[in-house]
């Protein structure tokens, strides 16, 4: 198959995906535009490239998945709910797809991934897409990135059992944590740092891979 053939097919299937996201209630133009312009097929194994623009989660190896586009879009809309965040901490960046989407929506991203080969893969793809406002680190997301705190937004694509206090402590005043929380049953939580303390809001039921402690080489 020629590159052009792949390109034309992916353009058509991308538009179909955008339409599906709109049908599911995703309305923010900049989020839809980011999903339209970021080539999702670069972030999955070649064998799965033909499924890149389906609205489904896809395996990326190491027991990890590339989040469903609807979930990426929903998290991105929530990220922008209080305006454009300047400094963002992303936990569990995987192969870098959500990172690439967010990069056009925020000023600066610090991204952490615990699996070393995925860090290298994400770095390579982000470089290929000329994404310049992301710093990527191999580390334990549950520790956050204290030396870069505070953050206007902390966003995670893996679920800890409980809200991690050390992450809440890295929020700027008025900053928000958007994270799936729980075991078998998970809730997407949004926690805002206010002068009176942390205000928690359950958004919807979700299903993410668990957020694990430690790092993996």
Q: Model-found features: residue ranges?
A:
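Class I SAM-dependent transferase core
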Residues: 2-89, 97-101, 105, 118-132, ...
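Conserved nucleotide-cofactor-binding alpha/beta core module
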Residues: 80-199
């Amino acid at each position: 198959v020629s590159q052009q053939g792949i390109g034309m097919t992916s353009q058509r299937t991308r538009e179909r995906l955008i339409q599906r996201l709109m049908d599911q209630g995703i309305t923010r133009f900049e989020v839809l535009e980011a999903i339209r312009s970021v080539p999702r097929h670069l972030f999955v194994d070649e064998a799965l490239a033909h499924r890149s623009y389906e609205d489904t989660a896809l395996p990326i190896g190491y027991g990890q998945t590339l989040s469903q586009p609807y979930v990426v879009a929903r998290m991105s809309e929530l990220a922008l709910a209080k305006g454009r965040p300047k400094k963002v901490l992303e936990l569990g960046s995987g192969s870098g797809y959500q990172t690439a989407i967010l990069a056009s929506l925020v000023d600066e991203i610090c991204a952490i991934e615990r699996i070393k080969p995925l860090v290298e893969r994400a770095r390579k793809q982000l470089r290929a897409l000329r994404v310049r406002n992301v710093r990527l680190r191999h580390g334990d997301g549950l520790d956050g990135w204290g030396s870069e705190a505070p953050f206007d937004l902390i966003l995670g694509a893996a679920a800890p059992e409980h809200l991690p206090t050390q992450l809440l402590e890295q929020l700027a005043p008025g900053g928000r944590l958007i994270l799936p929380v729980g075991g078998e049953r998970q809730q997407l939580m949004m926690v805002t740092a206010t002068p009176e303390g942390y205000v928690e809001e359950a958004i919807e039921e979700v299903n993410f891979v668990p957020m694990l402690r430690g790092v993996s080489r």
